[in-house]
A protein has these predicted regions:
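Hydrophobic positions on the alpha1 helix immediately C-terminal to the Walker A/P-loop
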Residues: 89
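A noncatalytic interaction/capping subdomain that flanks phosphate/NTP-handling catalytic cores
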Residues: 1-82, 92-102, 106, 112-222
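Conserved lysine of the Walker
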Residues: 86
């Protein structure tokens, strides 16, 4: 994790805006992980993410299970259950758009989201899933797109009720921790008021990218 965190290193004194977080692992925590069959690297990853998550919630942010892609300065979040193809679909955007647009993957698995007065912003972080793709950058969120596999491509906007039922399960918090749950729910209320949510049924094709681009940016695929 130290290597993954290197791009985010900063010189700062401890303060409410720059709190110190103890990410150290105790011997008992290492042993518990070993007994579960986790590798030392996985134990470290899970422990540090849990501590990071706790702190970002207190700072008015939350982590979301998605591949966050920055396209010409705006972020689109591709979300789905693990194994559906978030990373694969994001890779199609890099393949088919990078020659004409600036395409950057902010985080391939757990972007940090903050609801601000000027909109919702997505941030990169070192905790980025098995592909370890992340960038120390931020972008305003243009849309959230939930993916499901299908032989043909189609997309539709979802109702507010549907949006909540899709988004909440993909947020990260200790669901048995009442305070964490309340913090996430409060932020989601504002998040869903500001960000459109779509459901994309798609295959692995250039046409799927074109459909989403045209829908979100309301323009021709160029």
């Amino acid at each position: 994790m130290l290597r993954q965190c290197a791009p985010y290193a900063a010189q700062a004194d401890a303060s409410p805006n720059h709190p110190w977080i103890d990410l150290g692992l105790s011997q008992n925590q290492r042993e518990e992980g070993r007994q579960r069959g986790d590798s030392p690297a996985m134990v470290e990853y899970n422990h540090t993410f849990a501590r990071f998550l706790q702190e970002v919630l207190e700072q008015g942010c939350f982590c979301f299970h998605a591949s966050a892609l920055q396209v010409d300065g705006e972020a689109v979040l591709f979300s789905a259950d693990s194994g559906t193809g978030k990373s694969t679909h994001a890779g199609l955007w890099e393949k088919y758009l990078a020659d004409r647009h600036r395409v950057v993957r902010l985080n391939d698995d757990k972007p940090v989201l903050r609801v601000r007065q000027d909109g919702v912003w997505a941030y990169g972080s070192p905790w980025s899933g098995k592909h370890v793709i992340h960038t120390n950058a931020k972008a305003p969120v243009k849309a959230v797109v939930f993916l499901e596999q299908a032989p043909e491509n189609r997309i539709r906007s979802v109702t507010s009720q549907e949006a909540f039922s899709l988004v909440f399960p993909q947020t990260f918090c200790l669901k048995t921790d009442a305070r964490q749950r309340i913090l996430v729910l409060q932020m989601l209320d504002q998040f869903l008021r500001q960000v459109p949510v779509y459901l994309l049924s798609c295959n692995i094709s250039r046409e799927a990218v074109e459909l989403v681009y045209q829908t979100i940016w309301k323009g021709d695929y160029k």
